Amino acid sequence: KADKSVLEQKRPGLNHVGVTEGKKPASVTAYNNEMAKIHDELEAAKTEADRVIHDDNATPAQVTAAIAKIDAVQPKLDNAISLLHDKENNSELVEAKRQLDEAIAEQDPTPGMTQATADNYRAKKAEAERISSEAQGVINNGDATAEEIRDEKAKVEEALTQLTEAKNALKADKSVLEQKRPGLNH
């Protein structure tokens, strides 16, 4: 009777699958493509191993052949699974964007301010809106790298600083007051 212990030890490895939840979309695609390529070979190895394991009259040559099929496909399966990569943590970017969006949503503070300081504030606000939209794109991109997320967070924080500084730099337009009270200027 053929010794099937090695075959029985190796057979469960063919059932390994990659967990795609929380993985970068591009890595999931690579994994799926690789799994599709090896599908037939993998299924054939499983079928052959199961057949030989359950065949009481299997010969040593059949056991050896089944093991060879497993040994041929197992590294390909392991490689496919290794292609999966976790998504990067973007929670700090999400929080920075929330703070920026809060500042953008504030009531317009420019009425009654000098033209130059109001224009500066509006320009910084438009830039902040552009950066916020760009940040949302990075947040939505499951394939974003840690570096891309970090760089975008820095841009968001800079936009918030610029917007806050522009708000603090707003100056009341005194000429409006002077036009309304001409008698006091004499």
Where are these regions (language model features)?
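Beta-rich interaction/scaffold domains
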Residues: 1-186
